[in-house]
Curated annotation (Swiss-Prot):
Functional note: Involved in the gluconeogenesis. Catalyzes stereospecifically the conversion of dihydroxyacetone phosphate (DHAP) to D-glyceraldehyde-3-phosphate (G3P).
InterPro entries assigned to the protein according to its UniProt record, in alphabetical order: Aldolase_TIM, TIM_sf, TrioseP_Isoase_bac/euk, Triosephosphate_isomerase, Triosephosphate_isomerase_AS
Name of the protein in question: Triosephosphate isomerase
UniProt KW keywords: Cytoplasm, Gluconeogenesis, Glycolysis, Isomerase
CDD domains: TIM
Catalytic activity: D-glyceraldehyde 3-phosphate = dihydroxyacetone phosphate
Record GO cellular component, one term: cytosol
Pathway terms, separated by semicolons: Carbohydrate biosynthesis; gluconeogenesis; Carbohydrate degradation; glycolysis; D-glyceraldehyde 3-phosphate from glycerone phosphate: step 1/1
């Protein structure tokens, strides 16, 4: 049976003080959340240590937003797997479209980060997806297959989550039709050696569409951006019907 993974990606939002205020409202709202749902918060590096303490013993797992492929070294601005696992981080987002778009991430560096994450005991969340131009040109399927082929070289598919994030739906308010998201996620699954890899949908996920999204048979969770920044909003998503 495939695992359900509901992840909030805070991106570059929330100071330590703001993260603590969030938890005061968020954690009590999870008292009746089914235990089999894996809930995680992928937060800025500055929030990781304090949230590791605050989330201890709760249902919520801690995630980071990036990891370098080296154990240590002269890589200014980067962070290593051992640094993350030491403070209780369990998951890490790899290859998010914003990293690819703004910071020069390539399929080759994504692959190195995926391997490093697993080497140091982290579960990576690999993000794949197409732009509006690529979708309009009919390139969605070929692009995603290419990303998977390059990104997953020597990656253990028993310790992996994949997020399908159509780039044109991220932060735009435009949500991919749920049946279309389900179709593309089915395509992703057909390319994998392990059909039990949890595959999430990401892109303008909100309380008013989560139930429809999670009713799709191929979708195993969501990667939530803006709607994860507000406690009541993210709690409603976690507690989908």
């Amino acid at each position: 049976m495939r695992k359900i993974v509901i992840a909030g990606n805070w991106k570059m939002f929330k100071t330590q003080a703001e993260s603590q205020e969030f938890l005061k409202e968020f954690l009590p709202a999870l008292e009746e959340t089914p235990q089999e749902r894996e809930v995680l918060l992928c937060v800025p590096f500055t929030d990781l240590a304090i949230l590791s303490q605050s989330l201890h013993g709760s249902l919520v797992q801690l995630g980071a937003q990036n990891v370098h492929w080296a154990e240590n070294g002269a890589y200014t601005g980067e962070i290593s797997g051992p640094m993350l696992t030491e403070i209780g981080v369990r998951y890490v987002i790899v290859g998010h479209s914003e990293r690819r778009q703004f910071f020069g991430e390539t399929d080759e560096t994504v692959n190195l980060r995926l391997q490093a994450a697993q080497k140091y005991g982290l579960t990576p969340i690999l993000c794949v997806g197409e732009t509006k131009q690529q979708r309009d040109s009919g390139e969605t399927e070929s692009l995603i297959v290419s990303q998977l082929d390059k990104d997953l070289i020597n990656v253990d598919q028993t310790n992996l989550v994949i997020a399908y994030e159509p780039i044109w739906a991220i932060g735009t308010g435009d949500t991919c039709e749920t049946t279309e998201a389900n179709r593309v996620i089915g395509l992703i699954r057909s390319q994998l050696k392990n059909s039990d890899v949890p595959i999430q949908y990401g892109g303008s996920v909100k309380p008013n569409n989560i139930d429809e999204i999670m009713a799709q048979p191929e979708i195993d969770g969501v990667l939530v951006g803006g709607a994860s920044l507000e406690a009541a909003s993210f709690a409603r998503i976690v507690n989908y019907l």
